[in-house]
């Protein structure tokens, strides 16, 4: 029973996420955080639904989640990690780059993305690097390194 209570404390609701990230509809791509170690790692959920605007044109006959939005969802989970670091200056951390991103399987409406990110480094209190992975049904669909920068 105690383990369950402690794990629930490490979860973040959509309302809490809205307090950490500046993203709003239609670009808020994290539904909830199911594991959170502030400043170290986070695991989040993104439920992919046919009602999302990108599926009107990507592709109407065979809807696929655009790879850039999978990467953006990983970046938002990385942003949750970075924004909870106590010693960093306050400000807007933005997505600054990607390395070695690979897409392995398509993501379609009805899928649930499980996004896992881990902080790799912080430099000069303004640049961060995160390792991100996205899974559907336990299968890796995307992985790579994401960089962040503090905007003055």
Curated annotation (Swiss-Prot):
It catalyses: a (3R)-hydroxyacyl-[ACP] = a (2E)-enoyl-[ACP] + H2O. Involved in unsaturated fatty acids biosynthesis. Catalyzes the dehydration of short chain beta-hydroxyacyl-ACPs and long chain saturated and unsaturated beta-hydroxyacyl-ACPs. HAMAP family: FabZ (MF_00406). One of its GO terms (cellular component) is cytoplasm. Its EC number is 4.2.1.59. Its main location: cytoplasm. The gene is fabZ. Keywords: Cytoplasm, Lipid A biosynthesis, Lipid biosynthesis, Lipid metabolism, Lyase. Belongs to the thioester dehydratase family. FabZ subfamily. One of its GO terms (biological process) is lipid A biosynthetic process. One of its GO terms (molecular function) is (3R)-hydroxyacyl-[acyl-carrier-protein] dehydratase activity. NCBIfam families: fabZ, PRK00006.1. It is found in: Cytoplasm. PANTHER family: 3-HYDROXYACYL-[ACYL-CARRIER-PROTEIN] DEHYDRATASE. This is 3-hydroxyacyl-[acyl-carrier-protein] dehydratase FabZ. Pfam families: FabA. The active site is at 58.
């Amino acid at each position: 029973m105690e383990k369950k209570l402690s794990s629930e404390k490490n979860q973040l609701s959509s309302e809490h996420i809205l307090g950490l990230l500046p993203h709003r509809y239609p670009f808020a791509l994290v539904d909830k955080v199911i594991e959170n170690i502030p400043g170290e790692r986070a695991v989040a959920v993104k439920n992919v639904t046919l009602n999302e605007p990108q599926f009107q044109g990507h592709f109407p006959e065979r809807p696929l989640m655009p790879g850039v939005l999978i990467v953006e969802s990983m970046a938002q989970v990385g942003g949750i990690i970075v924004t909870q670091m106590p010693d960093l200056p306050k400000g807007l951390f933005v997505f600054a780059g990607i390395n070695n991103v690979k897409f392995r399987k398509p993501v379609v409406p009805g899928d649930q993305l499980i996004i896992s990110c881990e902080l790799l480094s912080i430099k000069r209190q303004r640049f961060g690097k995160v390792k991100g992975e996205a899974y559907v049904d336990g299968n890796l669909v995307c992985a790579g390194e994401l960089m962040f920068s503090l905007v003055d």
